């Protein structure tokens, strides 16, 4: 799978995803740092990448402004430790692979699909 990580996410996730056979790129490394959110979402859409972010503003772009996307994984994790993040992503990739083209909200105990 192809992923784009927002600049606010832990940079170690690129290596973590790559070691699992995925193609992962990150804003701030592979693309300029500080891109506006709408440009980040447009890059992901253009390149067919699933966006991984912890920035809730992407929900507004998708649902309020109807910006197209190829999937968003919104990490809504209070303690944002790397171990928790990777454990939750492992669950998402294993249990929700058929829903990765949607807007998924990932919390410590749940994965839900956000709709309008």
Task: Locate predicted features.
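Short, hinge-like loop/turn segments at secondary-structure boundaries
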Residues: 42-44, 68-71
């Amino acid at each position: 799978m192809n992923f784009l990580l927002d600049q606010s996410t832990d940079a170690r996730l690129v290596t973590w995803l790559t070691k699992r056979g995925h193609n992962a790129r990150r804003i701030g490394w592979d693309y300029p740092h500080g891109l506006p959110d709408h440009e980040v979402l447009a890059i992901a859409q253009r390149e067919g990448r699933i966006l991984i972010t912890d920035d809730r503003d992407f929900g507004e772009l998708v649902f309020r402004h109807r910006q197209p996307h190829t999937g968003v994984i919104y990490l809504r994790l209070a303690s944002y430790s790397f171990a928790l993040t990777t454990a939750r992503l492992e669950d998402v990739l294993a249990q929700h692979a058929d829903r990765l083209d949607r807007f998924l909200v990932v919390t410590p105990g749940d994965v839900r699909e956000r709709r309008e």
